[in-house]
């Protein structure tokens, strides 16, 4: 491996983002199955809700990676977001679903930084796309009113939670109505946009924590493939799976070392799970990943895929 140092990422198993997604929704964690889960070191809030734990979401959410920004010095950059005027280019359901995911990530990014005006603008865009995709239940007037109220109160935490709630509602509706193909496209669009924002924000020499999370996306990609496999008979899904191959080539060739798993509960009531595989990313690999992500993301937002 070349270049001056290695970026290490504690790897998650295929259930890592399932666990994170449930944590974002304040659901409980099934401790009986905890020994089967390999998670990177992070604090996850202890269970407080009575939500059914039998539901497993094996896909990433747009919000999860952006929570790291509170711990590192990263500035909001509106130029990284997909222009809302691009919606005029989106005519097919495939491209609408992909960009629904893109805009959901942009909403999460803006909300994380407390960008109230941008949050409202991107919520309006995904509401309109949701209507066109028949995902109406995720965007009732009550949610819209709550977003406006939080913008007026400059409440960035609630904006972030509402952006997550919107995505969750759309996810649940599509899953419950056997629209996994559309959901697959939304998830891929959101994940690609998250990687695009991250790889264009970080400095390889400085932002080691964010870089480790980027390297960790190898496991997330495996998780995505597993989720989409059920729907690959749909030509739109099989095509987007093929378009991920350049990203897969970089991530799957990262070096790794195995480490033991340790679990526990901290004094503040949060779960701490550490271990799994350690991934290493060189600067050349980071540059190759960034190039592959940029190419796919631009083809999505420009409706060229």
Regions found by a protein language model. Give the residues of each.
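C-terminal motif of bacterial Sec signal peptides marking the signal peptidase cleavage site
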Residues: 20-23
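Bacterial N-terminal signal peptides that target proteins for export
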Residues: 2-13
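Extended amphipathic alpha-helical interaction segments
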Residues: 156-241
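Non-transmembrane, amphipathic alpha-helical segments
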Residues: 88, 92-95, 107-114, 118, ...
């Amino acid at each position: 491996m070349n270049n001056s140092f290695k970026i290490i990422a504690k790897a998650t198993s295929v259930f890592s983002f399932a666990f994170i997604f449930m944590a974002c929704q304040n659901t409980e964690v099934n401790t009986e199955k905890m020994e089967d889960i390999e998670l990177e070191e992070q604090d996850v809030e202890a269970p407080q809700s009575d939500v059914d734990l039998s539901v497993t979401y094996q896909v990433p959410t747009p919000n999860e990676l952006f929570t790291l920004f509170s711990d590192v010095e990263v500035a909001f950059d509106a130029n990284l977001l997909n222009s809302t005027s691009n919606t005029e280019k989106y005519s097919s359901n495939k491209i609408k679903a992909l960009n629904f995911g893109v805009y959901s990530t942009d909403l999460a990014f803006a909300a994380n930084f407390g960008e109230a005006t941008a949050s409202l603008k991107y919520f309006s865009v995904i509401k309109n796309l949701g209507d066109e995709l028949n995902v109406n239940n995720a965007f009732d007037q009550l949610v819209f009113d709550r977003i406006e109220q939080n913008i007026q109160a400059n409440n960035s935490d609630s904006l972030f939670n509402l952006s997550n709630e919107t995505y969750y509602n759309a996810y649940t509706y599509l899953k419950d109505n056997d629209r996994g193909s559309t959901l697959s496209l939304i998830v891929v669009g959101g994940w690609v946009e998250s990687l695009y924002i991250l790889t264009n924000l970080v400095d390889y020499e400085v932002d080691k924590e964010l870089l480790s999370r980027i390297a960790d996306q190898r496991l997330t990609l495996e998780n995505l493939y597993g989720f989409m496999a059920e729907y690959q008979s749909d030509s739109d899904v099989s095509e987007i799976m093929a378009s991920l191959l350049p990203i897969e080539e970089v991530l799957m060739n990262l070096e790794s070392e195995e480490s033991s798993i340790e679990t526990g509960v901290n004094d503040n009531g949060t779960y701490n799970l550490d271990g799994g595989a350690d991934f290493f990313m060189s600067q050349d690999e980071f540059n190759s990943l960034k190039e592959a992500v940029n190419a796919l993301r631009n083809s999505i937002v420009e409706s060229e895929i």
